[in-house]
């Protein structure tokens, strides 16, 4: 039941992660330019927006639970539990939003360690409370939901504590929280396209899930188990893409465009090496890894099929994620949005439809929808990056900034 909710949860995360990215770019540019007043205004605006958006997310999230689950063709036998999980999750989504925004601020000023430590702490707390609520108190999916929102709230409190206690210009000043129009405009101009892209991509995954739901229950469970491995493999490249955005933003603010380009190259190389290594390990040990989430032989067999079909394409994600992050770092977020929506939404849905019409809803065709979207997106993103000011930055123009 929890596995069937992933697309809806990711839609919420994607929507606000985009705004977090926008805030991070604005803050990193101000930090790189050593503009302390602009930096402080951006931080106070970010936290104020988080209060407003968390209330909106809670209300809208609870209202869309039932329609979204039915849109996914969620089987009736798991519908009540999935609905219970999502209702609790959205009701407690404030912690997630504050952690995302707060950690985005820290990463924007070069502090990526503490958000990672807090995230690891939250993961451990989540496991402990999962065991306590689900195994100990036998609360089922409701217990899993409570464990998740408690762990997210604790991570948010830790991030807020760090940002409150610092003496740096990016400190949160609770008595001075307000919306500065210039900061709001910048955050939304950069973050809104990213939010739309991530939310609509997750929304399209609702339909992908409906294609998965066409197959038997073992396939659904196998896909859910595979998704957990997928999330693990993608953590490094997504983190490096965020680092790319921050690094480029700081150097863009400081007028060092060529240095930003060099950083993007190194980030891309690192992401390819790490992703390739994780891909090989996952393919070799797919059986034991999948059994950690579900030990049913039928479920494991389907999970291994997803790993075998999709995993060889993971390296292609490095190109679209790193280059998209770099483009956002210089304030160009509309182009990545258009490219990703075209690839991850339009092309993917067309691919699935053709698979259904011409190949009778084949399993392999359904599984290939994701990697084919990655390939198309990477090709388009490489072209866009090469044509950008960042991609064209020359060794003779180390300090040039092209608006």
Predicted region positions:
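Helix-terminus/linker motif at the lipid-water interface of multi-pass membrane proteins
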Residues: 1, 69-76, 132-139, 199-232, ...
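Small-residue-rich hydrophobic transmembrane alpha-helices
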Residues: 2-59, 96-115, 209, 223-286, ...
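Small-residue hotspots at the loop-to-helix junctions and early N-terminal turns
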Residues: 3-7, 82-86, 145, 217-232, ...
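Short runs within selected transmembrane alpha-helices of multi-pass transporters and secretion channels
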Residues: 20, 88-107, 115-123, 144-157, ...
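Hydrophobic/aromatic residues in alpha-helical transmembrane segments
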Residues: 23-24, 64-65, 102, 129-130, ...
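Short alpha-helical transmembrane segments in multi-pass integral membrane proteins
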Residues: 27-94, 136-192, 248-313, 356-403
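Transmembrane helical elements of multi-pass membrane transporters/channels
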Residues: 88, 99, 122, 151-155, ...
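Membrane-helix interface segments
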Residues: 112-114, 141, 218-219, 333-334, ...
């Amino acid at each position: 039941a929890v596995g069937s909710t992933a697309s809806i949860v990711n839609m919420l995360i994607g929507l606000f992660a985009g705004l977090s990215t926008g805030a991070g770019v604005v803050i990193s540019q101000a930090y790189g330019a050593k503009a302390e007043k602009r930096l402080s205004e951006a931080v106070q605006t970010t936290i104020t927006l988080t209060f407003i958006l968390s209330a909106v997310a809670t209300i809208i999230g609870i209202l869309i639970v039932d329609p979204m689950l039915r849109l996914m063709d969620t089987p009736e036998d798991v519908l009540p539990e999935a609905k219970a999980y999502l209702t609790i999750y959205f009701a407690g989504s404030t912690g997630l939003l504050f952690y995302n925004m707060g950690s985005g601020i820290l990463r924007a000023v070069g502090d990526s360690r503490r958000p990672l430590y807090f995230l690891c702490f939250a993961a451990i707390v989540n496991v402990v409370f999962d065991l306590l609520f689900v195994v100990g108190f036998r609360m089922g999916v409701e217990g899993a939901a409570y464990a998740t929102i408690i762990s997210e709230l604790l991570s948010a409190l830790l991030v807020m504590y760090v940002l409150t206690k610092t003496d740096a210009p990016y400190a949160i000043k609770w008595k001075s929280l307000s919306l500065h129009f210039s900061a709001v405009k910048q955050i939304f101009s950069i973050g809104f396209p990213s939010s739309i892209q991530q939310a609509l991509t997750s929304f399209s995954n609702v339909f992908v899930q409906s294609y998965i739901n066409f197959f038997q229950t073992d396939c659904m469970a196998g896909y859910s188990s595979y998704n957990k491995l997928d999330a693990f493999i993608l953590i490094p490249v997504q983190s490096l893409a965020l680092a790319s955005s921050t690094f480029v933003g700081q150097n863009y603010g400081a007028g060092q465009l060529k240095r930003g380009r060099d950083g993007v190259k190194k980030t891309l190389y690192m992401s390819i090496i790490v992703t390739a290594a994780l891909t090989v390990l996952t393919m070799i040990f797919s059986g034991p890894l999948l059994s950690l989430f579900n030990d049913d032989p039928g479920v494991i067999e389907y999970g291994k099929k997803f790993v075998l079909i999709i995993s060889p394409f993971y390296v292609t994600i490095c190109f679209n994620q790193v280059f998209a992050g770099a483009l956002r770092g210089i304030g160009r977020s509309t182009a990545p949005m258009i490219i990703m929506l075209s690839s991850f939404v339009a092309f993917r849905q067309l691919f699935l439809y053709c698979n259904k019409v011409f190949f009778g809803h084949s399993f392999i065709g359904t599984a290939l929808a994701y990697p084919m979207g990655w390939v198309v997106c990477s090709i388009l993103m490489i072209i866009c990056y090469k044509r950008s000011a960042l991609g064209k930055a020359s060794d003779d123009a180390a300090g040039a900034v092209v608006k």
